[in-house]
Amino acid sequence: MKEETFTGMLRDAFGSNRAEVILEALKEEASTAIRLNPLKAETEPEIVKGTFGNVPWCRLGRVLSERPSFTLDPAFHSGVYYVQDSSSMFVGQVFREMLGKPEGVLKVLDLCAAPGGKTTDMASSLREHCGNGFLLVSNEVMSNRCGILADNVARWGDPNVIVTSADPSAFAKLPGFFDIILTDVPCSGEGMFRKDEEAVRQWSGENVELCCARQKRILADVWPALKDGGLLVYSTCTFNTKENDGNVEWASETLGAEIATPDCGFPGVLRTGCGYSLAPGLVPGEGQYCAVLRKIGGNAAGQRGSRTSRPEKSGKPDGAEKLLKSLFTFDPVVSDRNGTMIASPAEIAAEIAVITRTVRTISSGVKCGCLKNGKLVPDEDLILNAFLRENAFEEVETDRQTALSYLHRDGIVLDAGIPRGYVALTWRGVRYGVVNNLGNRCNNLHPMNRRILRSI
């Protein structure tokens, strides 16, 4: 990395005095923060004890005094919280400021979503703001990153979030479909220098130009999918003005948009010409930029969801719909996907059908399990879902070591008084897994791809 080139860009973006503060902060250790899941975190999890403080722009955000081993915390695996940089949570605050009164299903696309921090943040805001009346499409074009995204969405437990894997251009087949689009675009990563040594090594002025061009292509490709009057949130984790304000100005002039960044300033957050910029030394977290564009024409996003046709009924085994309807607190539409029962909220089934017909879908609805001899063999995703009815399965509270043994995919044995059959396991009152209790032993149903690999 050419330090003088980087320093010059930093001064252009923040001014000389702030740039010096940021340069000193980049020599320090990165902070660690988590965001609580309001669907599951009824009380503060144990890991929050001794926190440095709350995140000013996120009531569910907590800055930790040190970085613990999240892998060895059952609450992490059950979706009680998500590990996310506090600066990244600022995008969620901007998103919340944009939400108007919805009429119909509010349709939102997180275009570059992996590993899922902003998706889960928006899901919490949409659930609070819209109830059941929203669809959040969480997309990741890189197939090798889709698995962790789908796992994190499953842990979060909201059935109104679906995961897709498509190039931004694929969404042009859905003209005007989305009310809001978040583009957390790939960037030069200057804001991640404290966490990513590879980003430091790869940084150059030439790479900034390449990133800038790629970001413009992404914006242009997805733009047709945004409805007239819809809102696009543009964000990066970098500092330089070319990838930030420069691209927002380009989009405004080229794509037909107006800059519509809401007023949501906080101490330490720099208001730029088009948006907001955060940097270490000025705030506890890492680097983040965020701005909002409104597509010229039509009504404002969040005011009216576009109409979609009803989906065709999917084939399903006899009795499956009745069985699954009894399991959820929402009204499910049941389908059979290669032998696995999927339950999707009826309120957004039409919108889900449009997406699944158009782009490659990794997961949609709740993966419930399969039927064997008329009985459901539950999938772990069903147990993790926050809208599974209480006591839908026998539940057993376990100690920490039993939870870790399950997550390590070791054999476990439950107390003799526990009924045989499928049992949901809980840690501090939150479900994290499921076993088939055979009496003298249990069949561990934790997916192999999610198991803890390190020694416990």
Residue locations for each model-derived region?
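Polybasic, low-complexity RNA-engagement segments
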Residues: M1-A41, P45-E46, E286-Y289, I296-I456
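Class I SAM-dependent transferase core
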Residues: C58-E97, N443-P447
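Conserved SAM-binding loop of SAM-dependent methyltransferases across substrates and taxa
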Residues: P115-G131
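Helix-to-beta-strand junctions that scaffold the AdoMet/dcAdoMet cofactor pocket
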Residues: G131, L226-D228
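Mobile active-site "lid"/loop adjacent to the S-adenosyl-L-methionine
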Residues: N144, D179-D221, V233, C237-D245, ...
